[in-house]
Amino acid sequence: MTATDVALFPFADYWWFYLAFTAAVLLLLVLDLGLFHRKAHTVSFTEAGTWTFVWAAMAMAFCFGLYQYSLWAFPQDPRLMAIPGFNTAAAAKQVALEFLTGYVLEESLSVDNMFVFVVVFGFFGIPQQYQHRVLFFGIIGALLFRAIFIALGSALLHFQWMILVFGGILIVTGIKMMFSSDEAIDPETNKILRLVKRFLPITNTLHGSHFFHIENGKRYGTPLLLCLVFLEMTDILFAVDSVPAIFGVTQEPLIVFSSNIFAILGLRSLFFLLAGAVHLFHLLKYGLSVVLIFVGLKMAWLNSFFNGHFPILLSLAIILGVIGASIVLSLVFPKKPDEEPAV
């Protein structure tokens, strides 16, 4: 038996963590909407930058806390102490690096998704002062769907052949992303939105920050609601790629869940920070495609060259290097005006 055969954080022993972590996240979200963003307003660049730093700092603090907790808890776990040659310090370091790598990977993939946010907000005519509210409730939905996807992914990975399937999905997704053209996004053709309109009348005008509007005793949905539904559907499709990608970094559900949630929490402020400049990163999709292909190859093939576990520090370096290079090259070689995608 080796360390890779044993779960470091089995759900039976750490169910309390999931409850406490989820409760803490919900509390943060309540404070965010009820205290810091009670009134609808346009999020300034300074405010977005401050909150981006705050969420990132909280993620790093959690990473450090997880490292310290691992140093304390692992020696008290008889399952781990029964593993020949188990090194507590090395295992704790591995946990911290896996969290950090998963967080960076999810945040990087989210940047590519921001272009969709910009287009959708523009399509539905959502003013900047109401965009935070849409993203707030969108993230609550994203947290729920991610939890479901992560639970399913964790259950499926008990079958070893599913690792190859996940790896194959990431490789195919990466290749498709690399060679796909930038197509115009048209929410009007979305089947889910058509279904919503069939069962719920929709107004053509906004009614403040409300998702619903009652007129003559009849309930109507507003464009804000349609925008929220479309973003939720987009996030579900996004999760199909991102969740397997993080399972390519670590197969510990606790690390996958926490790193994923922290990345999502920082997504709103990161959106307002980068929304005006996201179109500049035109080479980012190629960097992300390389990262997805790399993670897929790691799951399906490369791990076998390293006793079943590709070095996490090398994984982090490759992901940061590729993403950083694609961003820098995008700025050094800007896209020509006639190459801008239609929106």
Regions found by a protein language model. Name each.
Residues M1-V343:
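Multi-pass alpha-helical transmembrane bundle typical of ion/small-solute transporters
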